[in-house]
Amino acid sequence: MMKKLFTLLICISSLLLGFTSCGDEAFDVDSVNRQTLLVFMPWSGSSNTASLYENLRANVDSMCAGIKAQKGLKNARVLVFMSRNSQESNLFELKYDDSKKVVVRDTLKKYTDGAFYNSAEGMASLINEVKQQAEALNYAMIIGCHGCGWTYAADWVNYPYHARPNLGGTSSNYDYWGSIQFGDDPDHPKSRFFGSVSLDDAKIDIATLAEGIKQSGIKMQYILFDACYMGNVETAYELKDATNFLIASSSEVMSIGMPYKTIWSSLISTAPSYSGIVSGSVNFYAKSDAPYCNLAAIDCRQMDKLASIMKEINASYTLHSSIPLDSIQPLGGFRPNIFYDLGVYVDSLKPSGYLKEQFTAQLKATVKAAQSTEKVASYIFVNQGEEIRVKSYSGLSISDPSQNSVAIKGREKTGWWKATH
């Protein structure tokens, strides 16, 4: 028996040695592409207006500056999908030329079939193209465009006009805020609603994005939404099977977007610094002439647990009629408000000690990093902007208490509502 066991151990050892020395050359672990970052910048305008196009181009320039500051990309690759107009888009790679100390843009593929990405199949085909061009151990995604949280564009009837502030009077400064952009007809917005399924070909539903990522067979390490109002429980819950982390703002985002050069080292690392991304972005704006920004990093893998506790709370508690809605921290400028701070809302429900402790602990586990300036701003209704003081910011908003007709019509269709009621 001992002889048989000894012989078996020798065979196993030989087999393992064979696996580790089957080639003449040793496997170079450092040569593996560890992360591919897809920067997704779909068309944000209409057939005859460019909207955020110049801002998005400036964002790519800022990324290039970050790459130069880091003297390259090391074990990472960056592919950018950018729409030039409503029909044409390019997929190109940012490459660092070490000899010239510059970042070059290598075009990989040109698209002339419009907004093919507005379906799950189209989104999956784009991600699969990225995988084919730059296979990696991990994938992450930055999405730069307009946004209006989880809401469905089909539920809007009369849109508010969006007036952009004129900061300095130049045309470049005039397009300063990355919120909702509307044309002369308030029933036909030219902005991008993540949540739209029927407004026009340039709209993408959050569920469509999530399904497209899942169809590609990967799960993102993180998704950074450089867009307004995407930091909400409804969106985070919808993306829980598509990404590990969601980085997003619960309020309006300036059209100049995230300070990519400043936060680049935190973004491109194989172990991203979520606290670095959040603090770097908020501190950048806090020191600027327009000190309005909040941002949070959400662990979407914790969303099921958060929903489970929220369901227990909703089963026993409702918002008392004596509590005014304006006492719950607003994070947006819609009238009536759509986006309320999640932590303050739950406090307003006044759950029992046990449930409150459970919720607080789970919220802390879900929100890995969150930071806000003292105020955020909204330019939806007011040409010169209106400031919203932020006394409390948990890192996520919720639309459960909203009396806005869009929220009332749409929230029960969300996965979050179904999981918590």
Task: Go through each PLM region and give its residues.
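Bacterial Sec-dependent N-terminal signal peptides
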Residues: 2, 14-39
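Loop/turn elements at helix/coil->beta-strand transitions in domains of secreted/extracellular proteins
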Residues: 33-36, 72-78, 134-140, 217-222, ...
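Solvent-exposed loop/turn segments at secondary-structure junctions
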Residues: 43-47, 84-88, 114-115, 145-151, ...
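Functional beta-strand-loop-alpha-helix junction segments that form "active/interaction loops"
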Residues: 47, 87-88, 95-133
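N-terminal carbohydrate-binding/catalytic regions of secreted carbohydrate-active enzymes
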Residues: 52-68, 72-86
